[in-house]
Amino acid sequence: MVLTQSTAQAKYWNNPDGWKQTVEYLNSLGYEVVCIDKNSSYGIEGNMNYMPEGCVDKTGDLPLEDRINDLFHCEFFIGLGSGLSWLAWACGKPVIMISGFSADYAEFSSPYRVINKDVCNSCWNDISCKFDSSNWMWCPREKSFECSKKISFEMVKEKIDQCIKTI
């Protein structure tokens, strides 16, 4: 189960091929990848984010109970720093969280957290960075979202493989 959409571009996995490679990899392992985002595409004109090809589309504005039921049936969850990742964690599912904008201490503890600390990261928790909710493209340090762009598929694959070994 995957969640690829969020409420600000800084929260996305901005690696242009990341989700495509991840879904292809999971499909090659025999997994049916189900996308449970609210929307199949989201963003602003000129910067839209789309559900990856190869996913089963269960997007929609569904009740929380339906999402809990979806999560109950998944082996593990891959998502962003968002509410559904927290919900999956609360449901006891292993969560592979892809997030560069938030600090480790600001999210639930997970052995499968994916962050690249070799580049700009954790602006969300830096009190000198003032979040501008009216600016979809908010990147306070003007690094073009390198915090998540520089999270490679290989980094995510490593966490997927670790997770699969434990379930």
Placement of each model-derived feature along the sequence:
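Bulky hydrophobic/aromatic packing residues
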Residues: T4-Q5, D37, F77, S152-M155, ...
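Residue-level detector of conserved, well-ordered beta-strand and adjacent loop positions
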Residues: L3, T59, I115-N116
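Nucleotide-sugar donor-binding patch of glycosyltransferase catalytic domains
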Residues: Y50, W89-T166
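Short regulatory "switch" loops immediately downstream of catalytic or recognition motifs
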Residues: T4, C35-N47, D126-W136
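A short, mixed-charge helix-start or loop-turn motif at secondary-structure junctions
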Residues: Q5, V56, R141-E142
